[in-house]
Amino acid sequence: MNQLPTWHDVIGEEKQQSYFVDTLNFVEAERAAGKAIYPPAKDVFNAFRFTEFNDVKVVILGQDPYHGPNQAHGLCFSVLPGIKTPPSLVNMYKELAQDIEGFQIPQHGFLQSWAEQGVLLLNTVLTVEQGKAHSHSKTGWETFTDRVIEAINQHQEGVVFLLWGSHAQKKGRFIDRNKHHVLTAPHPSPLSAHRGFFGSKPFSQANQILVQQGKEVINWHLPMTV
């Protein structure tokens, strides 16, 4: 088997592409114009900082970053310590409490410990303007994150993709189901969680698949405070 690439290889290759240069230039220009862009520049690529390429076991796919102050820090669904847990994550915690024995709902929404265990918390779009959801969609980020998913699809085996809602499911349509495991459910948003996200048991299912492959499971439990 060929040696696995690193994120440095994958992202480095994309950095040479004109679309990606344009994306980064657009974001930089927006910041330079005085607009509040989230997450801060140092956090935009945190999903890759905390989960190395060859450590990826599970991928959770989000849409775009939270657009309120101090929320987004580069990991989908996660917020910084001290920030109120957003509604979709509240529902993820409710499902975890039903799905994972002994799971206690923490007083925060900081999911970095998942990332450090091999859960790639990837948004489709990696930046957003304050108060304007989807404001940075169609600026090139989607192409970049497609390439990220394609790299995992091509070079890894047995990764569990948790695709919640039609956006994530459409994004993941080219994943090779013979090599990887794709678990779908409605989005945990309050608008759709009751349509089948609750009761879908994605977290225990992911761990069962990892056990079958002889991989270490994800400890979904979170510290009560951070």
UniProtKB/Swiss-Prot annotation:
Its main location: cytoplasm. Transmembrane segments: none annotated. Keywords: Cytoplasm, DNA damage, DNA repair, Hydrolase. The active site is at D64. GO terms for cellular component: cytoplasm. SUPFAM superfamilies: Uracil-DNA glycosylase-like. One of its GO terms (biological process) is base-excision repair, AP site formation via deaminated base removal. It catalyses: Hydrolyzes single-stranded DNA or mismatched double-stranded DNA and polynucleotides, releasing free uracil. Its EC number is 3.2.2.27. It holds the Pfam family UDG. The keyword DNA damage applies. One of its GO terms (molecular function) is uracil DNA N-glycosylase activity. It is found in: Cytoplasm. Excises uracil residues from the DNA which can arise as a result of misincorporation of dUMP residues by DNA polymerase or due to deamination of cytosine. This is Uracil-DNA glycosylase. The lineage of its organism: Bacteria, Pseudomonadati, Pseudomonadota, Gammaproteobacteria, Vibrionales.
